[in-house]
Amino acid sequence: MIFPDKFDVIVIGGGHAGTEACLAAARMGCKTLLLSHNIETLGQMSCNPAIGGIGKSHLVKEIDALGGAMAKATDKGGIQFRVLNNRKGPAVRATRAQADRVLYKAAVREILENQPNLTIFQQAADDLVVEGETVRGVVTQMGVTFLAPTVVLTAGTFLGGRIHIGLENHSGGRAGDPPSIALADRLRELPLRVDRLKTGTPPRIDARSVNFDGLDEQWGDKPTPVMSFLGSQDDHPRQTCCWVTHTNERTHDIIRSGFDRSPMFTGVIEGVGPRYCPSIEDKVNRFADKNSHQIFIEPEGLTTHELYPNGISTSLPFDIQLALVRSIKGFENAHIVRPGYAIEYDFFNPQDLQYSLETKVISGLFFAGQINGTTGYEEAGAQGLLAGANAALKAQGKEPWCPERDQAYMGVLVDDLITMGTREPYRMFTSRAEYRLLLREDNADLRLTEKGRELGLVDDIRWAAFCEKREQIEQETQRMRSTWVQANSAEALQLADKLTAPLNREYSLLDLLKRPELTYADLGHLKGEAVANVQVAEQVEITAKYAGYIDRQQDEIARLRQHENTPIPASFDYDSVEGLSNELKQKLNEARPDNIARASRIPGITPAAISLLVIYLKKRGMLRKVAAES
């Protein structure tokens, strides 16, 4: 049957990408349908019970700045919060939260069920309605057809999913959930490049069987950080600790003894696993000189005894899993509640996508999350929000939007995927962003919330809070710029113990704040009243201390803008450019960059090759032609 109600946007999959996608489209006023094979697993944390970390928290904060759910759900479900790299510069600082799986999922479910314009329906999607080169809707497992001009596919590891434990394997989307076989087969009929990837998860341990004596405790930070710009410590449930233990030589011997029954080493698994989150057998094999690997013992929640031993993801046979676990300090009598496993699944070459995350070959069809070759909740959520927003824009007849690399980590993520593609699960790091001093997690709202408001992603409450914060930053910066401290004054004497050298002239508070030995806490109350909002104080201090570096990066961006504004026609014939090697022509033909800057970021494309492209465009008058058409 054809469902009587028509929708603007249909989202398939209720994981981290799917929830952000449907919420974004609904916030923008589109009539949105979320299809999930099981409503009880909306927002499920399929692997580790944590949100954030290096590079990842930047994405979470950006999702939050655009009105998304991930940071809010983390504050509601977070049972331990820490700021990583706290002693380093603000560009690489990252908030990480240990989460209670049940509380996190409940928070996501509450947000979904209270979102206007959003309908949820429990059914697996088996087919797409495609007419010519345009998507028209979705057909569910029981034959119900839902119609919409745009569809966002966020299938996670479910497309052709296959679970491996030792040499035994079976179909599955994750442990306990069926795969999407019919939909995977349908997608393979489309003119899209498909391949296989692999990820894995460790065995879960019953805390009652663990000896914690002698294990290092790891508590969260005080005061407790918050993830959302609108969050507070009052949102947090009871906080708890994690523990640290290590593998040993005996553990490694046990692991090696199972190599002949490992699906990784016997060729049973064809998919490539994540480089930066390898299985324990992969670590033992690749780093044979190491006699120990660290394991973080993470609680799965406040109302369960399950522990997540972060660092021993494995697909080894269960007898090897049990032996290796019990060889580890603290786990001598450990009971495994759930065995570890690897899962192999389909992903599609992200170079077949536009920057809106719409497929190039099927109009109206968007991909987000692991289907694009990424790994991680945060990477999925960021793509989901962008895909959902762009699906809404397309349904509304508006131009698509994707932030640039100098505007957001989201922009870095999408640009990396589309420009370079990936042959292994892609994970975000701060090192991937060349403008990371501008793209800090602390200023994500200042970078993106105004654009989010323009798109319709940001509600009145968030907008009012943002405007007030921005105004306070401007006012406090101006106050400190116009407030002066004279040499030998009472204020100068108060600072004497902290200064590396006495003041020899008059300084503004803002100039003093630029000194590495002084903080806003030292200066804010010196003459006048300091601001109470810690986010405001943080922005005033960071902007002052790093002003020179920030200006330098902005100058570099301005120079590169000349290339950003040099478009390449969609029909451009790279084979006709004399001087380009066949290898470079092939790379450019595969990536089809839409401007010179994106062409320059393709691996192997040299500055000399870029010069040839610019000269060719100028000689043929294509720069003027493209500019006139735009």
Swiss-Prot record:
Annotated keywords: Cytoplasm, FAD, Flavoprotein, NAD, tRNA processing
Pfam families: GIDA, GIDA_C_1st, SAM_GIDA_C
Binding site for NAD(+): 273-287
InterPro entries tied to this protein: FAD/NAD-bd_sf (IPR036188), GIDA_C_N (IPR049312), MnmG (IPR004416), MnmG-rel (IPR002218), MnmG-rel_CS (IPR020595), MnmG_C (IPR026904), MnmG_C_subdom (IPR047001), MnmG_C_subdom_sf (IPR044920)
Primary localization class, coarse: cytoplasm
Cofactor: FAD
Domain of life: Bacteria
The keyword Manganese appears for this protein: no
Biological process terms in GO annotation: tRNA methylation; tRNA wobble uridine modification
GO CC annotation terms, alphabetical: cytosol
One MF annotation (Gene Ontology) recorded for this entry: flavin adenine dinucleotide binding
UniProt entry tagged with the keyword Isomerase: no
Subcellular location: Cytoplasm
TM regions (residue ranges): none
Positions with a binding annotation for FAD: G13, G14, G15, H16, A17, G18
SUPFAM superfamilies the record matches: FAD/NAD(P)-binding domain (SSF51905)
Biological role stated in the UniProt entry: NAD-binding protein involved in the addition of a carboxymethylaminomethyl (cmnm) group at the wobble position (U34) of certain tRNAs, forming tRNA-cmnm(5)s(2)U34.
NCBIfam families assigned: mnmG_gidA
Assembly and interaction partners: Homodimer. Heterotetramer of two MnmE and two MnmG subunits.
Family: Belongs to the MnmG family.
HAMAP family: MnmG_GidA
Name the record gives this protein: tRNA uridine 5-carboxymethylaminomethyl modification enzyme MnmG
Naturally occurring in which organism (per UniProt): Teredinibacter turnerae (strain ATCC 39867 / T7901)
Phylogenetic classification of the source organism: Bacteria, Pseudomonadati, Pseudomonadota, Gammaproteobacteria, Cellvibrionales
